[in-house]
């Protein structure tokens, strides 16, 4: 309760829940927070007071419902916000360099990006999943049943690098990515960023940007590659905010350009690569010769839609 009250007080003091902007308090330190609480005891007490009344009111509602034969079901979303008290207090339990989402489907061509960090299950296992046990125990005080939103995410999640906006740049975790040697043996040498970094030609720039193509070529690129200031979708989104038609054209075009890769390097296993899902729609795929396209199709489909065991049935 006290760390949560400290989080609320710091959030109000700095005017943002983004704790990376809290200066000396950006990283949770128990002793520093305890000292802060002593200096701000009035504000800390207020947030504790609010939580106490929330607890008593919800407990009364639950008791009344049960006395009338009604049970309450609580909703348990798979993730928590990256600017939450949990992420601030327990950063080691989360992959803060990643975000959860969903691959593209008929309803979302670029996939979904939910924004919250994925769980670091290895660190959670070290204390017997104490964070989860405490979370479930607290919910059990009020609810008789839980609905777990996205139960599959406990076993396999669509993980997107934090610098990306589109779900297209994600990959499944856990997964078995291809090694650089495996890809090289199949005709895809990823050295120097080949197949993993966008390499647009004039035709692609013309299709994406129209009359703005020359501006993109001279302002955003050097030697056929995007400059560092435009090298991620997050940077592009920050660089071109708003709904102005020109800015929107540049932003969306650069976003699409950054999606234009065949493989994504695993951030925690250097030298291992995931095929970019649905990469057959990319300009880069179009530049492949027929034989290499066929090879990519097979390695892509075997990775995402393996059929080797589909003939097996459960006993």
Give, region by region, the residue ranges found by the protein language model.
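Catalytic cores of glycan-processing enzymes that make or break glycosidic bonds
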Residues: 1-312
């Amino acid at each position: 309760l006290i760390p949560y009250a400290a989080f609320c007080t710091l959030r109000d003091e700095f005017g943002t829940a983004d704790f990376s902007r809290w200066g000396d308090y950006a990283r949770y330190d128990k002793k520093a927070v305890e000292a802060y609480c002593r200096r701000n005891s009035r504000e800390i007490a207020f947030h504790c007071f609010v939580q106490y009344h929330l607890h008593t009111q919800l407990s009364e509602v639950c008791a009344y419902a049960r006395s009338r034969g009604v049970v309450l079901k609580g909703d348990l979303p798979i993730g928590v916000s990256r600017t939450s008290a949990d992420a601030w207090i327990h950063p080691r339990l989360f992959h803060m360099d990643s975000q959860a989402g969903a691959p593209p489907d008929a309803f979302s061509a670029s996939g979904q990006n939910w924004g919250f960090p994925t769980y670091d299950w290895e660190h959670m296992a070290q204390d017997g999943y104490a964070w989860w046990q405490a979370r479930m125990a607290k919910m059990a005080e009020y609810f008789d049943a839980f609905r777990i939103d996205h139960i599959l995410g406990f076993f396999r999640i669509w993980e997107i690098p934090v610098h990306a906006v589109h779900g297209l740049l994600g990959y499944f975790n856990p997964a078995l990515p291809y090694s650089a040697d495996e890809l090289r043996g199949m005709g895809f040498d990823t050295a120097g960023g080949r197949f993993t970094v966008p390499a647009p030609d004039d035709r692609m720039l013309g299709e994406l940007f129209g009359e703005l193509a020359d501006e993109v070529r001279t302002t955003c690129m050097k030697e056929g590659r995007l400059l560092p200031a435009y090298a991620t979708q997050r940077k592009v989104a920050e660089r071109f905010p708003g709904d102005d038609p020109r800015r929107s054209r540049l932003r969306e075009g650069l976003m699409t350009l950054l999606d234009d890769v065949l493989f994504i390097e695993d951030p925690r296993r250097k030298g291992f690569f995931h095929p970019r899902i649905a990469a057959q729609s990319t300009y880069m795929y179009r530049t492949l010769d027929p034989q290499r396209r066929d090879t990519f199709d097979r390695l892509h489909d075997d990775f995402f839609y393996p059929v080797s065991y589909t003939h097996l049935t459960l006993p």
